[in-house]
Amino acid sequence: MNVGELCKRAPVTAKPFDDLVAVAQLMRKEHVGYIVVVEPSVHESAFNPIGVVTDRDIVIGVVAKGVDPKSLQVSDVMSREPALAFEEESVGAALRKMRKIGVRRLPVVGKLEELIGVISLDDIIDKLVGELEDAAGSIRSEQMIERALRK
């Protein structure tokens, strides 16, 4: 399975010069803890990811330091040049990338590095658990059939 099949499309995004408080409110409204920061692409109606902001970035990097978030823009706290997962990349490769750099989410991009979606560790785990449950169900069914035939 590739990343493009599993990722969540149309992720919540922000621009670098957006007000940080407004973006925090957007996170709350949309029930997300991760926003991809984008800039317009040279390709029509596409956007390229240039950074990410997490709820943790805001809490640890701003609030806990006593900095007034009203005085900041997204670009002041975003992580720049995020690692990316490509749409055609395998889910296993994306998982290894996440583990190597210590993140739980990656922006997903197309061939021209235009933003397509976001893949998270939770998405991958949910998919794997579902597949394991399906496999376990098949094994149980086979065992039940075998027992019935032996009677």
Locations of the language-model features?
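Tandem CBS (Bateman) regulatory domains
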Residues: 1-10, 50-86, 90-99, 120-151
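Generic preference for well-ordered secondary structure
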Residues: 4-7, 16-19, 42, 47, ...
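A glycine-centered beta-loop-beta connector
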Residues: 27-30, 35-57, 98, 106-122
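The conserved cystathionine-beta-synthase
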Residues: 13-32, 37-41, 85-102, 109, ...
